[in-house]
Amino acid sequence: MAKLSSLLNPIISKILEIYVYSWYSGISKDALFPSQCEQVGGSIVHELEKRLSRQDAMDLLFYEIPFLLIKHIENTEEAKLRFALPQGQILEIDTIYHSLHPHIALEKEENELVYCRLLVEDILKYLLPATNSKSEIECVILREALAVQIHKSIQVASSPETMYKFIIYLSKAILQPSRRPWKESITTAVRWVWHAFRILLITRGVPYFSTAWFQFYLKLFSQKDNVSSSDLTRWFFFYTLLYPWIALVSAFVAETMTLCCIVTIFYDKNVNRQWKQYILTSVSNMDKGNPSGGSQSTNVTTFRRFSQSSYPRRSNYRRRISTSSKSLYELSPSKFKSIPITSNPPPMLNLSKGSTSVEPTFCETNASVALSTVTSTPVFSTDSSPLSSRTRENLLSLIPSAVSSPTKANTNKSHQRSFSIPKATKDSQTPSENSAATLKQAAIDAYSQIPVIPFFLPSDKLIMLVESEYRNKHIFYSLLNSFTMVMFPELRHTK
């Protein structure tokens, strides 16, 4: 799990630099504050590592994730099939998809940030040390910084342009000839397979075999939509006699292949460095729209350099004493109390339009918020996955009744505005739409050059799975919820 720290610590530091140091450097030059922030971020990563070692992450990897991906493919194909019917032409594919598998975070656009806030707020109660979790100011700052970054990351990752770029990058990586000698490449591949096999041996993956990844790959590469009556006998013979053995071997291959990808990210130095650089670059690019980021970049750099120059000289014992004895709120309460909260009044939501009852008071360029708007009752973010069906009503309680239980009279009207699907395209395309179409065609061309794989997974099916921003958001929020429920089982039993 030490590999996880090397991946997450730079990301946490970058988030703190953007959402905390950018505004704090303008009101104070306290060198102890950023040191405490770095310690809190390190404690969060350390606690997350301990939970990953204690909890059964194999359930998440070999059941929850492939289950959600299978449901995503099935619902997408079902929505496309219903859209092809004459009575389905009046609805969009995303609307049909939403009716098949609704997600509470996508009922309204305002719900997405509220969903991330509630999720991070409940997680921080178990990740922060006891002394730090008592500070309301500290919890609010960390909640807003992490929630906004998660929200922005999902917004960027779910866009079709990002998916097309990922397809192009992956296609070029597969087609690019290896610079290593073939013997070294084979040795490296065998080493990654051995790492993956060793992980399977020390977990429940072997005695409790999961065929979920095999079912996912079978669903992904399957091109036959239905089976004719003449093939029923053949399929019955196949599924009763041959399928269990094929599924057993294929499940082992699928699990090993999936773990090889994860092991490569953690153990391959080049891939690890490229992955961290990509994440940090993405986080920096998300903050380019910050109007105050450019004017404060120099102050933030100087502030961090000044604070970190004296911080490494302190021993680990002193750091633990400092963390356990003082929280961020106790360090400089006068600084926080002097922040003019009413200088930028929060925007009021129009409840008549079915928006959420929690006011989004966080300004993306400033991490200081009004403490009166902090949710005092823990409410857990859920979707309709098997792990979280019991707690959906908790988050629904934050949504007005017009959204949570629409009447039959305004069902069609509410579905047009009740969840954040992209707007209908117009006849005249904008330059961004033209660039998206060009990028889409480039992704299709690059993918078509890959050997063998396009034969089993046609490009039109691949594009259908990634072309919708709403459906991409749906799968990301569902994966986030499943990760939370598996790593934090305490949330299932909280009322």
From Swiss-Prot:
GO terms for cellular component: cytoplasm; cytosol; endosome; endosome membrane. It is found in: Endosome membrane. Residues 1-174 form the PXA domain. It is a multi-pass membrane protein. GO terms for biological process: late endosome to vacuole transport via multivesicular body sorting pathway; protein transport; retrograde transport, endosome to Golgi; vacuole organization. It comes from the Eukaryota. The keyword Protease does not apply. The keyword Transmembrane helix applies. InterPro entries: Phox_assoc. Residues 402-436 are annotated as: Disordered. Residues 402-419, 427-436 have a biased composition (Polar residues). Keywords: Endosome, Membrane, Protein transport, Transmembrane, Transmembrane helix, Transport. The chain crosses the membrane at residues 7-27, 235-255, 446-466. PANTHER family: SORTING NEXIN (PTHR22775), SORTING NEXIN-13 (PTHR22775:SF3). Required for required for normal vacuolar morphology and for vacuolar protein transport. Also required for endosome-to-Golgi protein transport. This is PXA domain protein 1. The lineage of its organism: Eukaryota, Fungi, Dikarya, Ascomycota, Taphrinomycotina.
